[in-house]
Amino acid sequence: MSFTVELPKDKSSIIKVIGVGGGGGNAVNHMYREGIEGVDFFICNTDAQALESSPIPNKIQIGNALTAGRGAGSNPEVGRKAAEENIKDIIESLGVNTQMVFITAGMGGGTGTGAAPVIAKAAKDMGILTVGIVTTPFIFEGGRRCDAAFHGIEEIRESVDSLLVISNDRIKEIYGNLPISKAFGYADNVLTTAAKGIAEIITIAGSINVDFEDVKTAMSDSGVSIMGMGLSEGDDRAMRAVNQALNSPLLDDNKIQGASNLLVNSSYGDEEATMDEYAQINEFLQNEAGRDATLKCGLCYDDKLGNGITV
């Protein structure tokens, strides 16, 4: 297997999510199971076994001539060459209706670190709004992996419109001595929250909508971005949710002061958001960011929230 894409052009979404390498693939598998409204999922890897075991229907094996399907051996240069070997396949997949793509990868290994910047550059060169969501390694994974991650982040930063960097190492600081699988699971949840939060601003019809052009204006060539999410219910739920969002523990440097653009998506459940709550959220964020920041704000219903509100 080298190339399996099941996307009829008339049914393809304008938003694609591509998981690159082992870490990116695991994250996108998780996203796929959790569900993100109105996006198409892809997985891209040198490792044929990882592709075979993934539930994602759209799979691109890269670098088969180079690695014979055995992975990149933690060598980013192999990952880069593998992506270049199959760049036409990647471009062909992205050419189906795509206006926005999320590229997720774990930085520090071979395929994700090396291939993700190549794929991102191809997407951006096609005029697609390109958003990178990447993780940095745990310190215990070793200095060499951390160094590779640093260089990988510098490379992908040059190839995307917007980059979100999620620190795996902060998981241990915040949550303590977790089982390994649970620690990586927390990171997958944050990746999912980031992609879902941005994509569903566009794809879910709400009481107040943010359209694709608003998102494009906010994120085109915006550099490093940050994101947070909060959920609360009961008294003062709106302010507690927005404060949680601004203190999201797994995103580095989550300060919005001086930001030029803010995308704000608030959702409510059975208890509809009031005008005062909507105003509280947006006015608080405007004050935190500064009066020069442009806010694009959406509001929608989510039947899973009960009496809660999310920001």
Task: Indicate residue ranges for each PLM-predicted region.
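Tubulin/FtsZ superfamily GTPase core signature
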Residues: M1-V311
